[in-house]
Amino acid sequence: MNVRIKTINIKYVGGRNRFTGKFLIDRFTDLTKKGDWNKMKAMVLNKIDRLENNKKPLHLVEVSKPAPGIKEILVKILACGVCHTELDEIEGRTPPHKLPIILGHQVIGTVEKTGSDSARLKPGDRVGVAWIFRACGECKFCLEGNENLCDQFMATGRDANGGYAEYMTVSEDYAIKIPDVFSDTRAAPLLCAGAVGYRALRLTGIEDGKKLGLTGFGASGHIVLKVARHMYPNTKIFVFARNQKERLFAKELGAVWAGDTEENSPEKLDYIIDTTPAWKPIVEALKNLEKGGRLVINAIRKEDFDKDYLLKLDYSVHLWQEKEIKSVANVTRRDVGEFLELAAEIPLIPEVQEFRLEDANDALVELKDGKIRGAKVLKLN
């Protein structure tokens, strides 16, 4: 079969071993059938653009397989979750530092090869790679266990090539073993939606028997609900979601009430976790917060389209009476490890929709359009 290809230069940023290679971009999505052990397939982002303008922002390419450096591992990728953060990277709200880049930060795979001085992991181990790709390990934040706040924090799929590919490299210290109870595709969303949701739940300071609100009910929201019901069985959970399917799903999973993001909850809430990319739900959540309550914003950024809604903030209604607002910034390896142990104990099996690697654009468009029931995951190999 004749396949037209285009060659572009790319600087690979998969770890300490940095090199300049070439991407071979297939103008079709059919790659040559000839096997090449030194090549891999990947979905690559070449430029920033809104999804409304380009519904296929990622291109299927063939690229040289990376080699693990000192204390690194080569991961054969089996699954990778699809996250709202990828939309932010594609559309430029949290842009990658360099292009082209391979997105994806909810990576499940097996160790194919280890680099020199690697001792913790061995070939065949099943591991996960989360949003945290690397931190300096030496600053005050890292030394205090807050590596998520490190100024040199590197994010998987944004600052280094991620999991929308057949292989990736990562420092073995930032790869986390995956419990056997989870399949590959169901483990993937636990690394981001689950781990960051778990961190948000901890940051609320929740006590059993109090009332918890969840604003937004995508991948992270439905996992937080399951975790909260397990850890705090006497806590009533109220869900605010933008469409009827999400609200019905929340009720199926045990929410005592589910309404629109603009509705008033039937009771004041002691804690609310917001997982939306918008400002309006923040203002409405503060209105539903109990005196002395805490709102935790679980979002890497907020979009500007409804920023004017902040003008509706009224100090006496939304902020007075010692209401608190706290944000979540990234995750630590401890968050991911603790959450995976907890999820295996419950066991917490997330709802997923599977897509092929080459259909990553379709998954992203559905996510953008709000077609959500559980988590979207790319299944490879």
Task: Spell out what each predicted region is.
Residues I5-V13, F23-I108, V170, K379-N381:
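Short N-terminal strand-loop motif that marks the start
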Residues L24, F28-N38, A241, V283, ...:
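C-terminal hydrophobic helical "lid"/dimerization subdomain
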Residues S64-C80, R93-K140, Y174, P179-V181:
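Glycine-rich beta-strand-centered segment in the early N-terminal region that forms part
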Residues V127, D180-P266:
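Mid-domain Rossmann-like dinucleotide-binding core that forms the NAD(H)/NADP(H) cofactor-binding site
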Residues A135-T215:
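NAD(P)H dinucleotide-binding glycine-rich loop of Rossmann-like/cofactor-binding domains
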Residues L269-I273:
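Short SAM/SAH-binding signature in class I
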Residues W279-E351, L380-N381:
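Glycine-rich phosphate-binding loop and adjacent beta-alpha segment
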